Design a protein with these regions (language model features):
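N-terminal low-structure segments adjacent to metalloprotease catalytic domains
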Residues: 1-31, 67-68, 98, 129-131
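Generic detector of well-ordered alpha-helical segments enriched in charged/polar residues
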Residues: 27-30, 44, 117-124
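Active-site scaffold of zinc-dependent metalloenzymes
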Residues: 31-78, 91
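Structural motif
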Residues: 74-75, 100-104
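Alpha-helical hydrophobic/aromatic positions enriched in membrane-embedded helices and signal peptides
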Residues: 78-82, 98
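Active-site recognition of the HExxH zinc-binding catalytic motif
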Residues: 82-94
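Short helix/strand-bridging catalytic loops that position acidic/His residues to coordinate divalent metals
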Residues: 94-100
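Post-HExxH zinc-binding segment in Zn-dependent metallohydrolases
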Residues: 102-131
Length: 131
């Protein structure tokens, strides 16, 4: 597993990201989710996905301007790219909802691009063989 923490100062937001997770990472992931005050249904889904080593799955939970992103192990780079961008989209939508940002406007797209750029140094290992 790879782990990354970063801030988004413009939105006073903190992100905790877990990459390439397996059952061995369950305690760290559950602690992050519980620290954020996640619901029982989200916690159950996360526990099932991670403890059963479900591949090509992800989860994003946000509360109080904090987000936990969990990216499970992928079967190939295409599936990782799908899960990675999918969960980035959820995080960006959570930020947009908190701040009343137009979901059809440029600002949301800049949030998505910014998240992708900050996460790329960690994600690149799973996106291509050359990184």
């Amino acid at each position: 597993m790879k782990y990354q923490e970063f801030d988004i100062p413009k939105y006073d937001w903190k992100v905790y990201a877990f990459y390439d997770t397996t059952a061995d990472d369950i305690d760290d992931i559950m602690m992050c989710l519980y620290d954020l005050g996640c619901t029982a249904s989200i916690a159950k889904q996360a526990y099932e996905n991670v403890s059963q080593n479900k591949k090509n799955t992800g989860l994003t939970f946000s509360k109080d301007r904090q987000t936990c992103i969990v990216l499970g192990r992928a079967t190939d780079k295409e599936n990782f790219a799908h899960t990675y961008t999918h969960e980035i989209g959820h995080c960006a939508m959570h930020i947009a909802k908190e701040y009343g940002i137009n979901p059809y406007g440029e600002e949301l797209c800049y949030i998505i691009g910014g998240l992708g750029a900050v996460m790329l140094p960690y994600a690149s290992k799973f996106l291509c063989d050359c990184c």
